């Protein structure tokens, strides 16, 4: 699978839809999937989904025949509050999943409800992906649930405002890749948002096996800095599936001894 990592510069009070649409159109015939950062549309008020912006993304995805994992939208559901929701759009321009962010930042908890549903989706007739926005990546139980449902590729969206925090997030990314023997595509926030300057740092890692058939070191195949750019990585999901058949940290399951 060829995946485009789109690290857009997003400023809080600017409009970015045209940049998003141009990125998707440019990716046509080059990639299978385009991934955007968490706050990819800027600061917008909650509204019912799909919004006009999301509808425009759907149409361009259809014309480009490419899958898209959006950053969070502010999904207003009358009678049920607002959620931070990542839309997964297929090559036909259809929304195949609406994945609600579960682990909210303290400031987000004042305005949004935490999701309780699935954090995975299926693309191209059977390729499972897990989508983890913000702190969801740090919740081992959420990642494990997505993998158990069939996620073969983990997509994370994060916002780091210092080199130290970026290194912390990258450590978590590598841990998830090693734990589940699955590649992780992590798209970093770039630009001034919420009064902070986010430094990008988009990262892609993949697990490896040693000659003895046990997990080796995680390989970092992309490590962006603070540039606004789109990079394409190619991931052999069949090879990682075979790797998981040969070894698993969860098989056999641990059974506590009776006291």
Which role does the model predict for each range below?
Residues 9-16, 129-134:
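Active-site mouth loops of central-metabolism enzymes
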